[in-house]
Regions:
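Conserved catalytic-core segment of NTP-binding enzymes
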Residues: 144-146, 153-211, 337
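ATP-dependent carboxylate-amine ligase catalytic core
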Residues: 5, 19, 25, 29-40, ...
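Beta-strand->loop->alpha-helix junctions that form or flank phosphate-binding loops
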Residues: 77, 192-195, 207-224, 245-249, ...
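N-terminal leader/targeting and accessory segments in enzymes
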Residues: 1-51, 55-70, 79-80, 96, ...
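Nucleotide phosphate-binding/pyrophosphate-handling subdomain across enzymes
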Residues: 43, 130-131, 135-140, 147-158, ...
Length: 421
């Protein structure tokens, strides 16, 4: 163990707990109590919700870095390298730094069977602590109430939105899911919610915990016309905001959330109009409507539920509407295949389904049968991801548009493959 590399550590962590997901805070709190983890008192952001967490986090990250702060971020899952999960000023930490944190967790863990995610979460907190990050941006993994990230005391809790996803863990209705997501609301700590449709369980939890609750559309908003938008927060406003042309409502909501969170924790950190427009002009998040221009135009998006597919559709519609799309799709077994596909189908000329390199992936046979049974005839299959990518490359023309979507587990390999081409 002393001489293990990162890959060996990660493989071993997968064997510690027989369950891949084992929602409970008892184990991680027990181990955390033996470590010195001290998040910044005024700049610790805990970001939950169904969709938009990564984009909201990235916007806050860019704004705080622009203001000269040392910003630590913890996100999951990763696209290709585990190190992507733990970044300081957007730069992934190196293997040796991660391994030192793993060793420290293991030295105090004793016989407590931490899950892979719990072990990594503790290592992330140790790393951000040891590197003296002035702000912590923490993305919730699954749900909220029992998620490993929920052991920290945030300065603000952010819930982006509530949609159907992970129903086997979080509940089958929006209110049940909202109750789990609301678990990140801390007593007397402000919370912001990024959807005008406020679930009763979020409102009730905030009330019970004495937390000030700020709701998009009620307490803060972005309004006006394109190129001259105005963000209005609690007491502050930013005028003449230029939103990127390919953004849809989801990204606009994420920006509203990011700005509101910053105003609440420290309004002095809000950007000027010039600073914000410069930031937005250069803003991107890997795997979120990421456009890679080769011979063809490749669009990579990690959307994996119907709510995310709706936003993806709006972004696709912002492009040339006369160009039909070839879509490469794979989804995990717990995802709603038809709910996802029917949102995008009329934009797609040809579907190619394939299986990801994980036992949680839907089989290619299941994906193809579901699409055909739904009435989609323009669907073919590939035996694996690389076959799907290369077949599409070889059978499409210059400037054709190719969408790869459905999971981090297909977008990551696609990005790696495209980088090597």
């Amino acid at each position: 163990m002393e001489n293990w590399g990162l890959a060996e550590w990660l493989h071993w962590q997968e064997t510690l707990n027989p369950k891949e997901i084992d929602l409970s805070l008892n184990r991680i709190r027990n181990v955390a109590s033996r470590l010195e983890i001290l998040p910044p008192e005024n700049l610790t952001f805990l970001i939950g919700g169904t969709n938009g967490k990564g984009t909201t986090l990235a916007l806050i990250e860019d704004i705080l870095i622009q203001k000269g702060l040392k910003v630590g971020g913890y996100t999951s899952p990763h696209l290709n390298n585990y190190n992507e999960r733990i970044c300081v000023n957007k730069k992934p930490v190196d293997d040796s730094r991660l391994i030192e944190s793993f060793k420290l967790v293991e030295s105090v863990r004793k016989d407590i069977p931490l899950t892979y995610f719990e072990f990594g979460t503790l290592a992330a907190f140790i790393t951000l602590n040891d590197l003296n990050c002035e702000a912590w941006l923490i993305e919730v993994g699954l749900g909220g109430r029992l998620d490993a990230t929920n052991i920290i005391s945030p300065s603000i809790s952010i819930i982006t939105n509530i949609a159907l996803d992970h129903q086997e863990w979080l509940g089958s209705t929006l209110e049940e899911i909202a109750k789990e997501k609301a678990g990140i609301i801390s007593a007397k700590i402000p919370c912001i919610f990024g959807d005008p449709s406020l679930p009763k369980n979020i409102e009730q939890t905030a009330l019970e915990k004495g937390s000030d609750l700020y709701v998009l559309g009620r307490d803060f908003s972005l309004s006006g016309y394109w190129g001259r938008l105005v963000w209005q927060g609690k007491d502050a406003a930013i005028n003449s905001i230029r939103i990127p042309s390919h953004w849809a409502e989801g990204e606009i909501d994420d920006l509203c959330l990011a700005l509101m969170a910053i105003e609440i924790v420290d309004s002095e950190l809000l950007p000027t109009t010039k600073e914000l427009n410069h930031l937005l002009n250069n803003f991107s998040v890997s795997g979120r409507f990421e456009i890679i221009e080769k011979k063809q135009t490749w669009i990579l998006d990690v959307a994996h539920n119907p709510h995310a597919a709706e936003n993806l559709r709006k972004r696709l519609e912002s492009l040339d509407p006369y160009k039909k799309i070839t879509a490469i799709l794979s989804l995990m077994q717990d995802k709603d295949i038809i709910g996802f596909v029917k949102v995008l189908d009329d934009l797609v000329a040809h579907w190619i389904v394939c299986e990801m390199d994980t036992p949680r992936s839907h089989s290619v046979q299941t994906l193809q049968k579901k699409l055909i049974d739904y009435g989609i005839s323009n669907v073919t299959s590939a035996s694996g991801l690389l076959e799907a990518f290369s077949n599409v490359k070889n059978h499409t023309k210059k400037n054709d548009r190719i969408l790869i979507t459905g999971s981090f587990e297909i977008v990551g390999p696609a990005k790696k493959w495209l980088d090597s081409e």
